[in-house]
Every structure is written in structure tokens, then in C-alpha cells.
């Protein structure tokens, strides 16, 4: 069994007030992840790569990454993933899976161009693999879509990942 814990980049305004919705920063993920680990559950870290909810209609770039080109954003995403996942692992959380992006049907982290989204996915996946190697853990990489009723569209999305050799292990699908 897994518990899925979302992580937002910086869910606080300029005065340090949380946006609400749980203020799911890495510290919160560590606290909840330690509790889940204590009870024998594996943890899936769900990086939204946004300061608040990311879904098919809202894939806003984090404040700290605004104005970055795709190369800079890709590097920032790699570093954010590696640093935060390492913190979670160092805190003793039993991470078995990391979700790179949340509900990325129409884009990710402010990017809508498919090649840019794939570049971000590749950076996130590499960061997960690097953190897993450093910690000696086997951690699955997941990509996540939602409400895809058309199997042809899902096939197109997944074929795009395979053709571009994006490194992932599993696909998460949410339906509401």
C-alpha cells in the first residue's frame, strides 16, 4: 500500500502565509511520510512543480522559476526534485515511487509544448534515479494523467514518451 503525498514548491505568499489546501511543502511531506513509514506504508511523493494545485487547467510555473527558459527550468526542476527527494529519504521516509508532475495532460510547470514537457519529465526522472542510486533504494518513476476517456489520446501521450525515451516505470491515471 502507498500513501501519495503532494509537494508544492513554495505554497506561501510574500508574508509567509500559506495558500491553504494543506500547504503541502516538503516539510509537511516529511512529517506525513515518517508517520506512514512508521505504519509500514510505502510513500509516493507527488511533485506538482507548482506553488499550488496543478491539474489539466492549471499548470502554473512556480514563482521562483518565472521568466526561466526551458533549459533553466529543466535544471531548476532537476535540482528541486533531487534536493527535496534527498531530504525526504534522509528523514527515513520509505519512498517507493515518485510522481513527476501532476495531471499533466495539457502541460506541466507552465509549459504546454510537448517537447518541453518531455524535457521536464526527463529532468525529473533523472533526479529521481540519481537520488535512488545515492540512497541505495529502488524508486519507481510515475507520470500522471487524468480523465482520459479516449484510449487513442492516452496511446498518443504514452507513445510520445516512449519515442523520446522518457525514463518512467508506471503511469498513474485519475478519474473524477
What are these model-derived regions, one by one?
Residues 48, 129, 176:
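Histidine-centered active-site/metal-ligand motif
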Residues 9, 145-147, 174:
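Residue-level signal for short, function-critical loop segments
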Residues 1-38, 42, 48-76, 172:
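N-terminal substrate-binding region of glycoside hydrolase catalytic domains
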Residues 45, 49, 114-117:
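A broad "ordered helical/assembly scaffold" signature
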